[in-house]
Amino acid sequence: MGGLPTLRIEPVPLERKVRPGDDLAELIAESAELEEGDVLAIAHTVVSKAEGALISLDEIEPSPFAKTLAERTGKDPRVVEVILREAESIVRVGPDFIITEVRGGMVCANAGVDESNAPPGYVIVLPEDPDRSARELRRRLRELVGVDVGVIITDTQGRPFREGVVGVAIGASGVPVLADRRGDRDLYGRELKITIVALGDLLASAAELVMGQADEGTPAVIFRGLKPELERFEGPRKARAIIRSPSRDIFR
């Protein structure tokens, strides 16, 4: 992508665990020195916690259909019931997963319902509107520290035909999530015809290397030095733009 700038990725360990109702921007501002042009990548789990998107399994009564799916997938029937409530539709069911479409059109495993990093007896669900959450976090950070930063909300997803999970951007504000390279030239002068780079997902995956997936306790990172590169692109600034339309989805 041309002459790449020097890039730094700095972890942002928060001072304490996030609780429902917390001002997440305030916690971040207390834990990190933000600069103009930084990009903040933050795990959706802490965004969801701050927004109160925690569900107590003790309050869930599984439906007969949830119990049937639980038998097929080996999952807790209460977790399956939460998945069904969060999903717009079911795409596929496997021996240990339920592939779903959720609000906004994103296709993911188990409707994004997360048991990891949730308090015992609870599950975390996705933010109601991750792009809106990113936009509000960006606005609040600008209000608190007086600098404009990009924000990406991350999750991890599997991919068809590939083992393992990678980071993806499920919410964004102030960052081009797609870089259209069509019309650029390769090393031999040939015009690129179809290359569109998923910048949001690339940043989310890089962030996951620093955040970790277990008990590392680093729910956010700062990218510093990206501003000159990102200013080259005029792509969409919402993560929803990364979602492929059903008419172009060859896997359903």
UniProtKB/Swiss-Prot annotation:
Disulphide bridges: none
EC number: 6.3.2.31, 6.3.2.34
Cofactors: Mg(2+); Mn(2+); K(+)
Keyword terms: GTP-binding, Ligase, Magnesium, Manganese, Metal-binding, Nucleotide-binding, Potassium
Keyword Metal-binding attributed: yes
Subunit structure: Homodimer.
Family: Belongs to the CofE family.
Xref: SUPFAM superfamilies: CofE-like (SSF144010)
GO BP terms: F420-0 metabolic process
Pathway(s) per entry: Cofactor biosynthesis; coenzyme F420 biosynthesis
Cofactor stoichiometry and binding remark: Binds 2 divalent metal cations per subunit. The ions could be magnesium and/or manganese. Monovalent cation. The ion could be potassium.
Keyword Secreted: no
Functional description taken from the UniProt entry: Catalyzes the GTP-dependent successive addition of two or more gamma-linked L-glutamates to the L-lactyl phosphodiester of 7,8-didemethyl-8-hydroxy-5-deazariboflavin (F420-0) to form coenzyme F420-0-glutamyl-glutamate (F420-2) or polyglutamated F420 derivatives.
Stated name of the protein: Coenzyme F420:L-glutamate ligase
InterPro entries per record: F420-0_g-glutamyl_ligase (IPR008225), F420-0_gamma-glut_ligase-dom (IPR002847), F420_ligase_CofE_arc (IPR023659)
Positions annotated to bind GTP: 12-15, 44-45, 49, 117, 211-218
Reaction(s) this enzyme catalyzes, per UniProt: oxidized coenzyme F420-0 + GTP + L-glutamate = oxidized coenzyme F420-1 + GDP + phosphate + H(+); oxidized coenzyme F420-1 + GTP + L-glutamate = oxidized coenzyme F420-2 + GDP + phosphate + H(+)
GO molecular function, one term: coenzyme F420-0:L-glutamate ligase activity
Sites where the protein binds a divalent metal cation 2: 156, 213
UniProt: a divalent metal cation 1 binding residues: 114, 155
